[in-house]
Amino acid sequence: MVAPIPAKRGRKPAVATAPATGQVQSLTRGLKLLEWIAESNGSVALTELAQQAGLPNSTTHRLLTTMQQQGFVRQVGELGHWAIGAHAFMVGSSFLQSRNLLAIVHPILRNLMEESGETVNMAVLDQSDHEAIIIDQVQCTHLMRMSAPIGGKFPMHASGAGKAFLAQLSEEQVTKLLHRKGLHAYTHATLVSPVHLKEDLAQTRKRGYSFDDEEHALGLRCLAACIFDEHREPFAAISISGPISRITDDRVTEFGAMVIKAAKEVTLAYGGMR
């Protein structure tokens, strides 16, 4: 009765250790790929990453796809090169430090707040959860104002920044996203019909800015426009948010022009193209 006990205890570490070793190796390889992409200061081809890692293309692609699903990397351009993803912001600053994005953006946000008199936000796209994440904000001085924490998330279909991102996607991409996420109703004004949402996105593309008309919170309006990188890919958006009593119907176009101008300024300063 005594002999089997040590044998059972001796086998357990071996069973647990083998998978752990493989998992650690995959994690190490994935992190090294992430570092090489960050050091490229732009984007890099799959074959080049595989060569640097000393791995087959298939293994490298599997690791990259896993990180892409979590939003840490993204594919850009017609050649499908790999670049740092926005979700890296959630665990580190690689995405922002690559070109001191916040240092570029914040003065423009402050100028936009002073010009509009309303709270101004900057958001990036979380590709894993398909939500807009606020990474910077300049609040207005009004007692009644929009207030959301840095790191706060907003739904794609019911927010200014989210709809600005959606408007840059193809109809097929939008349809896939809607099937995956659904269209939750936050207020009576939320666009819960795919047809109505797609019509709204068409208007967004035509105007150059999105318009959240009490679709996420009653009494709150928001207008947003995208910022583009050097691959003409949208990766962030600037928005103006305020109560319907100040963002009135007759001023919507005026605020829209302001946010378009600010987004273009950031795109240019960042070295992006539209």
Where are these regions (language model features)?
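Short, solvent-exposed recognition segments
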Residues: V2-A3, R9-P13, V138-H216
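N-terminal helix-turn-helix
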Residues: V2-L96, L102-A103, R110, K264, ...
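Short, structured helix-loop boundary elements
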Residues: Q23-L27, L46, H81, G85, ...
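A structural signal for short hydrophobic beta-strand segments in well-ordered beta-sheet cores
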Residues: V73-Q75, M122, I227
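Amphipathic alpha-helical effector-binding/dimerization core
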Residues: E78-L79, A83-R180
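Cysteine/selenocysteine-centered motifs that mediate thiol-based redox chemistry or coordinate metal-sulfur cofactors
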Residues: Q173-K176, G182, A263-R274
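Extended hydrophobic
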Residues: A189-A263
